[in-house]
Amino acid sequence: MGRIIRVTGPLVVADDMKGAKMYEVVRVGEMGLIGEIIRLEGDKAVIQVYEETAGIRPGEPVEGTGASLSVELGPGLLTAMYDGIQRPLEVLRELSGDFIARGLTAPALPRDKKWHFTPKVKVGDKVVGGDILGVVPETGIIEHRVLVPPWVEGEIVEIVEEGDYTIEEVIAKVKKPNGEIEELKMYHRWPVRVKRPYKRKLPPEVPLITGQRTIDTFFSQAKGGTAAIPGPFGSGKTVTQHQLAKWSDAQVVVYIGCGERGNEMTDVLEEFPKLKDPKTGKPLMERTVLIANTSNMPVAAREASIYTGITIAEYFRDMGYDVALMADSTSRWAEALREISGRLEEMPGEEGYPAYLASKIAEFYERAGRVITLGSDERIGSVSVIGAVSPPGGDFSEPVVQNTLRVVKVFWALDADLARRRHFPAINWLRSYSLYIDSIQDWWHKNVDPEWRAMRDRAMELLQKEAELQEIVRIVGPDALPDREKAVLIVARMLREDYLQQDAFDEVDTYCPPKKQVTMMRVILNFYERTMEAVDRGVPVDEIAKLPVREKIGRMKFEPEIEKVAALIDETNAQFEELFKKYGA
């Protein structure tokens, strides 16, 4: 027990805190607000409070809980919506109405709900941390694998029969090597600032297929990879994040709304239950965990929400699932660090951010990865992290963007210019990059098309050539260009408008499978080759631009059947042959 001696915003200083530990959770004041000790000096503790501190005064008590900030991991996480410190918002609403009262807590996982548990081990089996004790069908899409906590190993001396149990009931007893008996329930707690252990990391060789053509073809994300989406306001960060949350081929999605508008979380809540998972036909919400920490919630909890989210993601990874984590936006998290650092009177670094900003960002992103999980069987799981960054005024030289780019391997640069021209996703193909292309090309060649890399590089060259020609056109106008270069402009425009542009609100175009992406690319590149051949044979460029097949190529993105898209190649060839006859070429 201690007493408050000073309150500054979300920061409270208390004395008489003998026996307190770093990162211990405490209850502050008469209301019992939740806080966390972030600095100890003698018997004084500096506490960051995760709730509004108005009305708290010196002299009020501070009570330690003896535990660090932890999350509950077990059945009931999926479809749930939490705040930054894993309080279930639906339950809090029942307790206090639409606005959360202060000092409220509720268990993160439902205590009274019964889950159907099927054991996978028997008495006498030797188990280690990470082994699967049994399974629970948590939603129609995901089977929840109940794991032995990482710190437990020994022999099973008792395991329950198949049946319905709450998460508080003991389902197994393990005799440890020292003879102690450890009781296991369906859930366990894990401190959020500690990364969950695994056997070893694997190289990122499998792409995370998102169904967004720009991303999959040009700037691919790998399973277990890290990506950043920086962009100015209104350039489509949140919609891109939503698209990735909807369509990426991860089995579980953790969506952290960190310091963004409340309406954006409402969007997710309204859309996801209606949307069907393309693989199973069940609502997408059944594979999603939402962490809502909107801009009008206390600043300190933003910092916690990022860690809460990644810990939940690591837990599903340990079951052997591929998890995608969306953090929207890491800038707001960095601003929370800046505010708390300022209250602590630390030396500011660049633009007032704390000097340790770079290491905090790196610490978060390095928890991503594709790994062989703990346990006797060789399960492979992955956490792919995609962080949005909102630099003020779209300035990419700002510290959060620069420190993020040092650690992530994929950079999707959103461009306000493209967004103004209604080119979505507004990913600038000249500034963006992916360092995973070399490691994932084998997957594409084996599973989709052996010519994928060659076609991708060819298309990229065309887009870069177009950018060079655009500068000349601005100075001397398009008529001064030779025919071959005019042809490049025509085909590059087709690439931009018919391939890169995608409609997130169209039923067909919102998700483009890899096979269709490659076929569309082949149609456009075939048109390019025939165009060059025609120009060399003396066919005027204006005639090529008027070919009726161009309109069909423009509409192919809305065509669900891949065969019909592939048929455009023959149609293109036939129309060019007619041109050759007409011009006697």
Curated annotation (Swiss-Prot):
Record: residues binding ATP: 231-238
Molecular function (Gene Ontology), one example: ATP binding
A cellular-component GO term for this protein: plasma membrane
Keywords associated with the record: ATP synthesis, ATP-binding, Cell membrane, Hydrogen ion transport, Ion transport, Membrane, Nucleotide-binding, Translocase, Transport
InterPro entries xrefs: AAA+_ATPase, ATP-synt_VA_C, ATP-synth_a_Xtn, ATP_synth_asu-like_sf, ATP_synth_asu_arc, ATPase_a/bsu_AS, ATPase_F1/V1/A1_a/bsu_N, ATPase_F1/V1/A1_a/bsu_N_sf
Top-level taxonomic group: Archaea
Biological processes per GO annotation: proton motive force-driven plasma membrane ATP synthesis
Entry-linked SUPFAM superfamilies: C-terminal domain of alpha and beta subunits of F1 ATP synthase, N-terminal domain of alpha and beta subunits of F1 ATP synthase, P-loop containing nucleoside triphosphate hydrolases
Subcellular location: Cell membrane
Membrane topology value: Peripheral membrane protein
Enzyme's top EC category: translocase
Catalytic activity: ATP + H2O + 4 H(+)(in) = ADP + phosphate + 5 H(+)(out)
EC number(s) reported in the record: 7.1.2.2
Major subcellular site: membrane
Similarity remark: Belongs to the ATPase alpha/beta chains family.
NCBIfam families to which the protein is assigned, alphabetical: ATP_syn_A_arch (TIGR01043), PRK04192.1 (NF003220)
HAMAP family hit by this protein: ATP_synth_A_arch
Quaternary context: Has multiple subunits with at least A(3), B(3), C, D, E, F, H, I and proteolipid K(x).
Function: Component of the A-type ATP synthase that produces ATP from ADP in the presence of a proton gradient across the membrane. The A chain is the catalytic subunit.
Descriptive protein name: A-type ATP synthase subunit A
Gene of this entry: atpA
